[in-house]
Amino acid sequence: MTKVSKSKGIIKKVLIYFTIISIACGMALCYQIFIFENSFAPAGINGIATMIQYKLHFSVAYMSLLINAPLCVLTFIFLDKSFAVRTTVFALTFSVALLLLQYKIIDLSFLSYKTDNGTSTILAPLASGVINGIIYGAAIRLNSCTGGTDIVAALIHKKWPEQNLLWIIFALNTGVAIAS
C-alpha cells in the first residue's frame, strides 16, 4: 500500500467520523428545537426515553446512554466491528450534545420552534420527522445507526437475515410511536 492510498484511507475515515458526529449533533439539535419544546415523543428507544423524561424528569441524554451502552456492546460482539464503533460514536455524541443543549451550556433556545399555545401538533413533528429521517438515512449509508431500535433491528436481522432490515426498523419504531 502506498503512502497516497494510506493517506486517502485516513482522510476517508476522518470524513466518515466527522459526518457521524455532525449528524448526531444535528439530531440532538432537532430534539431541542422541535421535540422537547412541543412535548411529543419521536419513534424509537429515544421516544421511550422522551416519554420518561416528560413523566419522571430523567434526561433523554442519560437514558439514551443507559439503553445504548449495552446495545452497543452486543453490537460489537455479534455484528460488524466497524458498524459497532460508528454506532457507539453516534450514540455518545448524541447524548453529549443533548446534555450540552439541555443544560444550556450551549444555549440555542432562540432557535426553538413553539406556537402561541405552547405546542405544535403538526409542523414540529413533521419537521422533526423529516430531519431525523435524513439523519437515519445518512447514518445507515455510513454503515452506522442512531442506536436503540436500529441496533435491536440489526440484531434481529442477523438472526433472521431473510427479514428486510428497514421493515424491522419500521415495525419497531411504529410500535414505539403508537405507544406514545
Model features per residue range: what roles?
Residues 2-180:
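Core subunits and conserved enzymes of cellular information-processing
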